[in-house]
């Protein structure tokens, strides 16, 4: 319905932090607000990518944060709706850990090429936020 409001107009940028868990997978949340924000159901990954594909002008950017294990699903859905994954940033809890999140930037009608950015590490060895995270959150003691 939101995309319908923009019928005929095109966006330069679309940003989304969608529900991460496929419908029917994972432990169901009892609280409706948690279920809606964590589990597909009210909206699916494909519906989000389809709406972004319709909203974006050619060359427009689509930014999405998602769970790292669903990276292939994200790439496939984006590509199906004419959005080419162009940039990836992984997010790791600590240095040396496997990524748990990916930040994907896609371009409508984007062509070839994929750029991998340096991973974002959330915590240092003492469990404190890294300077990168402090900077992203706007803390002044960095």
Question: What do the PLM-derived regions correspond to, one by one?
Answer:
Residues 1-4:
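Conserved SAM/SAH-binding loop
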Residues 6, 22-28, 60, 72-74:
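Short acidic/glycine-rich loop or secondary-structure boundary segments that cap or lie
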Residues 9, 13, 18-47:
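Mobile active-site "lid"/loop adjacent to the S-adenosyl-L-methionine
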Residues 12, 89, 123:
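Residues in well-ordered beta-strands of folded domains
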Residues 41-99, 103-104:
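Conserved Class I SAM-dependent methyltransferase catalytic core
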Residues 96-142:
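SAM/dcSAM-binding transferase cores
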């Amino acid at each position: 319905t939101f995309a319908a409001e923009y019928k005929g107009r095109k966006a330069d940028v679309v940003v989304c932090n969608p529900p991460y868990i496929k419908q029917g997978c994972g432990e169901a949340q009892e609280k409706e607000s948690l279920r809606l924000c964590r589990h597909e159901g009210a909206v699916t990954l494909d519906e989000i990518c389809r709406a972004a594909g319709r909203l974006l002008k050619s060359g427009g950017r689509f930014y999405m944060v998602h769970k790292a294990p669903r990276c292939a699903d994200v790439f496939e859905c984006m590509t199906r709706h004419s959005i080419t994954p162009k940039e990836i940033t992984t997010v790791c809890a600590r240095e040396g850990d496997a990524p748990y999140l990916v930040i994907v930037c896609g371009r409508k009608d984007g062509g070839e090429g994929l750029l991998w950015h340096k991973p974002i590490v959330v915590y240092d060895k003492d469990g404190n936020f890294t300077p990168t995270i402090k900077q992203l959150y706007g803390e002044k003691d960095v």
